[in-house]
Amino acid sequence: AVNDLEKTESYFLDKLGFSVRFRVDGWSFLSLGSFHVMLGYCPDELPARDTHEHSYFAYVNCEGIDEIYRDYQQSGAEIFQTIADKPWGLREFGVATPEGHRIMFGQDRPLGG
């Protein structure tokens, strides 16, 4: 649910590299490779940023995470968690949308020890 469909869609397209699959009244269907997102216009819903820890929207498993991270830095995407190797076997970072939805991107890496 997003309060401003046009602004949110533009962010996904311009900052995160998604493309439009199709649009229907109040909905925008976007893709990034094989990852798909449906944005629904809900003007009266509480913005994601106001839900605090419940604002996580998606986790994207991907390849080439360092390149994706650099691309997002260069595009001006809002990065709320910098890229890092995590003890649970992933290299990951997080971005936030203008309304505060948080999306994590992660790539598998070998576990040490």
Please identify what each model-predicted range represents:
Residues 2-5:
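Conserved beta-strand-loop-alpha-helix junction that forms the acyl-donor binding cleft
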